[in-house]
Amino acid sequence: VITANPNITVMFAPYDEFAKGVKIAVDEAGMSGQVSIYSADISTADIAAMREPGSAWKATAATNPAVVGEVSVRALAMLMAGEDPGAQVIVPPTLITQQQLNDGNITNMEELAAKLPAFAHADVAAPDWMPLPSAPSQN
């Protein structure tokens, strides 16, 4: 796709594993300077790929898997207490940019959660009677 369409300037990958493949293709085509990659989802390996010098992978929107689990347990607790968490419980994604990762010297998921509070917590499925976890300390 990339070599057949040399005027491509932006690629979107709806999943981080797809973004890894797009990045490899862009790198192999020597087009890292002209193509910007945007995606959804993140992992420690993705952070490393985004932070590579000259990386075309510019940003991703993601939710923290630990927070998704936390919210799921809270929604279950609400159901067990006879409360309705709603038909959908949506954990808002966080925009994570290459610049944030580089400026914050973020190299893994733990550092990402510590340095981007929006990635570390979600105020959904949180009734008044349920204590929320403490926000991680910022380093």
Question: Which residue ranges define each predicted feature?
Answer:
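Generic structural signal for alpha-helix termini and adjacent loop/cap motifs
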Residues: 4, 53, 79-83
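Short, charged, surface-exposed secondary-structure boundary motifs
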Residues: 46-50, 69-72
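Short, glycine/charged-enriched secondary-structure capping and boundary segments
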Residues: 25-28, 52-55, 75, 110
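Short beta-strand elements at the ligand-binding edges of bilobed clamshell
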Residues: 52-66
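Hydrophobic alpha-helical
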Residues: 1-49
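Hinge/cleft segment of the Venus flytrap/periplasmic-binding protein
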Residues: 64, 68-139
